[in-house]
Amino acid sequence: MKTQTVLAIGAHIGDAELTAGALLASCAVHGGKAVTLALTAGEKGAPAGADIAEYRRGKIAEAEAFAKELEGEAYVLDYEDGLLPDNDEVRFAVCDIIRKVKPDIIVTHHENSMHKDHIVCHRIVVDAWFYAAIEGFQRELPKHFAKKLYFAENWEDAPGFEPYVYVDVSDGYALWEKAIDHHWFAVH
């Protein structure tokens, strides 16, 4: 893999790390830049009885620890888990991060899912990818066209998903295993 910047975007912290984490780790091993963006913290997945605000802070720390392991970056937007708005405010927030990060590759959710936030995230990212590339959408940063936009699935996004790209991530797999262990869900 030539040195590239890969931006993996998920509806929740943990989504990108699971669906594209090994790709991000492989990118990092080869000198590229690995970046995650979560549109929500995924705080509604808190264990029974847990304080939601405290759990949210913990999830953000997990995202940062994962990114640090890859010498990358983690961004988390401040939208509520389960209630991700399907609007241009979110699309332009994602557009701005695309323009800031300047990825060669973006990976996000497949269009079908049992989780509404994953479906909305897919639509947001497709539009934000377009907005980021068009100079006519005046923003603080100049346009950037990410040459490749790929879709990944996890167990929630499998309906209708047909794999169409396979990447050898074996060089980064050990690093991904180490990084994913920073996530509570991976060790409990």
Predicted stretch roles:
Residues 1-101:
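Active-site rim/loop-helix segments in enzyme catalytic domains that contact anionic ligands
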Residues 2-9, 85-188:
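Metal-dependent de-N-acetylase/amidase catalytic core
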